[in-house]
Swiss-Prot record:
Gene that this sequence comes from: JAL43
SUPFAM superfamilies reported for this sequence: Mannose-binding lectins (SSF51101)
Family matches, as Pfam families: Jacalin (PF01419)
Domain of life according to the entry: Eukaryota
Positions of the Jacalin-type lectin domain: 1-96, 99-241, 244-389, 403-488
Protein name per UniProt: Jacalin-related lectin 43
Alphabetical list of PROSITE patterns matching this protein: JACALIN_LECTIN
PANTHER family: JACALIN-RELATED LECTIN 3, JACALIN-RELATED LECTIN 46-RELATED
Amino acid sequence: MLIYNADSVVFLFSLFLQFEINHLQDEHLESVDAYYNKKSYGLQAIQFKTNFRTSELMGYSYECTMFTLAVKGKKIIGFHGSDNVHIYSLGAYFTSITPTRLEVKGGMGGKKWEDGFDHDNVSKIQVLGGFEGILYIKVDYIKNGKLETGLIHGDSGGDGFLQKMEINQSKNEYLVYVEGYYDDASETIQGLHFQTNLNNPVMMGYKKGRKFLLASNGNKIIGFHGYADKSLNSLGAYFSRATPNKLECQGDCRGMSWDDGCNYDGVRKVFVDGIGNEIYTVRFEYDNGGKVEKTPYRRDVKNEKEFVLDYPNEFITSVEGTLAAPKSVNITWITSLTFKTSKKRSSPTFGSASSRKFVLEKNGSPLVGFHGYNSVGNTLNSLGAYYRPIPPTPDVEKLKAQGGVEELLGMMVFELDPLERITSVEGTYDDKIGGITMLRFKTNKKDSPYFGFGTLPSFVLHKDNHQIVGFHGKSSNMLHQLGVHVLPNGFKFVS
């Protein structure tokens, strides 16, 4: 029996097996692999794949024929089929995946242009730069597997220098973010810095002016829009969910599969269990938008040890391992693991190293999730990983100080826990004394007490979908003005 709702899929095959889909993290079901018995024609096993991870195989695939339910660029929203004692057929309903639109950054001068979002990928970018900034941008796309030539947005008749960038489709390369520089005086974008998932950066134009960022974590750019006339005035982008950047399993890819997925921001802790030249199991403590998620035990542990990272200031960038080379048994397993980080640190070597080495890494990108196979017996047979390029932290934005002219008693403390962030500050200003008489802080978890006198705020320091990361203001023997520095939610300082 197959039971499906918006949050989970349940498959009943002698036992109750369930696979949950996290819609709050934009996870959706992309495909289903089903296995039917050649003699009874009943469905004997099933496996679900989302945009982040793959479920365990539910049932048994022995002496079965496999078929797949999938439509490129769409997600599954329902099922249909036939059953009696067994499920004999299975089909699915699909719908399109809505892209994410990031509004334009820069100025509002010029004429509006729109490339749209119904593309598979960006193919080629051309930018004509001049002394006063970028004169035009032209982007070619891949649509339904074919090249689609884009239009020129801006002034094609100006004098300048032409720069080009091509995206390598054969290596599944795609754009992950664009960093731009805008000059307020000329109302023109001065430079554009493009970054791909393969860590191939290209800078076009000049790093001059106010910096902005077009990025959507875990997504790829599939289209652009903006404003232009005699020059490029502003730029926005469309994003769709990217195929996970997956490093395939190293070792023996047989046994019981497991997949933690790739929808994490980073790894906080690593737990490895093993004795001698046998690694039994590995599990991880991840960070997911500030929430700590620890993967479950995959078996009873005997000698588990841990490696702690300084997250969010430190990431795993590579895993070095070794494999057993037994002469009498036609299998292998992992005998040792060593984790290396962005701070040039290495974990202790877990297990006992052999001469058969492997490495999981991708151009220094953070490894944000893992998958692998465990044997039915004791050992970890293979290990793979997911990696993700991390967009740069945008420039801190400064909100104007609130209060009075440029000319309480005791001390009170409001403490935040490590995963808590300030989202807004309320305050009251007294014109007679020229100072702030009350402050109240709000976080993503709670509100502070009222500091000072009064409970009716006369100003609020807040920006939607941003967190407060610093303060500024003016004071003498009292606080006259208070302002804040903000960053978009989800961005973290990484050294």
